[in-house]
Design a protein with these regions (language model features):
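Glycine-rich, basic loop-to-helix element that forms the pyrophosphate-binding segment
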Residues: 67-84, 144-148
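Catalytic donor/gating beta->alpha subdomain of glycosyltransferases that bind UDP-sugars
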Residues: 164, 169, 175-230
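Short aromatic/hydrophobic "clamp" motif used to bind/position activated sugar donors
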Residues: 89
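Conserved donor NDP-sugar-binding/catalytic core segment of glycosyltransferases
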Residues: 97-130, 199
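N-proximal low-complexity "stem/linker" segments adjacent to membrane-targeting elements
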Residues: 1-26
């Protein structure tokens, strides 16, 4: 009888998924008591082929469930747990490697007949001199609750309402679920012995600019949980971004009005504040020519892009959030 269901959302990342599945197949847990549900966020032949290589052979309880169209990881996880047979639902991601004892430790600390959630220990290996992107990803190690390494009873998910599919990117959907657990008085237990390794994926040059789009979901999370957002979410650099934009605007006004003194003050402020952002991002990171040039170039763009997406989210979700 299935007692626990592992849900793994994925989409067109067969190599990463393969490594994750290898780790899940090595769990020190009776293979007849757990199922693995791989949910593809849309039609995905490569993922289907990867799963079919193992279905009924390496693991008797593995299922592939594609969404009819791409809706985001929150929707994929919902589809998975709603079709799960276990009373306990464990979540991890396709780019993660669960420790062989991961599932056993989660189940050992979870009463399937209670409304309870669990969060494990996530390890993000980074180099001695990491990139800015690696350093940001490493923050997952100190996060309170992330879907890369968590579990809960199915009843707890039902009570909390599952994942909010408005979070259509991989950002803040796990915080939203955590806050809903808190609002519904569902305890969240930390299980240090349930370990997942979350390697940092290779990222393209300038990835930090693309990442700014996720900030629009900060507005949605704030609208739904203003008290918990203020208490638990640390805002990074918004004041600095606004100051940079203000200095840039002063420079433009000075140029347009031919007020050279005003233009110079604005230029000096913009350049100085942007330089401080560059140095903050380079602190304790890799000082290669490629990385330094990336930090310099993207730091001139990020304040404008970040504030744009933050305001976009505020307008879209109709909330005062700056």
């Amino acid at each position: 009888m299935i007692t626990v269901s592992i849900v793994v959302p994925t989409y067109r990342r067969p190599k990463l998924l393969t490594n994750c599945l290898k780790a899940l197949l090595l769990q020190k847990f009776d293979k007849w008591l757990y199922e693995i549900i791989i949910v593809s966020d849309g039609p995905d032949e490569e993922t289907k082929n990867v799963v079919n290589n193992w279905v009924g052979y390496e693991h008797p309880q593995m299922r592939y469930m594609p969404l009819p169209e791409k809706k985001g990881p929150a929707a994929a996880r919902n589809y998975g747990w709603l079709n799960a047979r276990g009373k306990v639902i464990a979540f991890t991601d396709d780019d993660c490697t669960p420790d062989p004892h991961w599932l056993r430790e989660l189940v050992k600390n979870c009463n399937p007949n209670q409304d309870v959630a669990l969060t494990g220990k996530t390890i993000v290996p980074i180099s001695k001199h990491p990139t800015d992107y690696e350093q940001n990803t490493a923050h997952l190690q100190t996060a309170d609750f992330i879907t890369a390494n968590c579990a809960c009873t199915k009843n707890a998910l039902i009570k909390a309402g599952g994942f909010d599919e408005q979070f259509s990117m991989a950002w803040r959907e796990d915080s939203d679920l955590e806050f809903k657990f808190i609002d519904n008085n569902i305890p969240i237990k930390k299980v240090e012995s349930a370990i997942v390794v979350h390697p940092v994926r290779n990222s393209p040059w300038g990835v930090s600019i693309k990442e700014q789009k996720k900030t629009m979901y900060n507005a949605l999370l704030f609208k739904k949980h203003p008290r918990l957002y203020r208490k638990k979410i640390k805002q990074t650099r918004p004041l600095l971004y606004y100051c940079i934009i203000a200095a840039f605007a002063i420079m433009l006004v000075g140029i347009i009005s031919r007020a050279h003194g005003v233009a110079f003050v604005g230029f000096a402020g913009w350049l100085g504040l942007t330089s401080s952002l560059i140095f903050k991002r380079l602190y304790a990171t890799r000082l290669s020519v490629s990385h330094i040039s990336e930090m310099v170039a993207t730091s001139f763009v990020i304040p404008f892009v970040s504030v744009y997406w933050q305001w976009y989210g505020a307008v879209k979700y109709r909330v005062l959030f700056i």
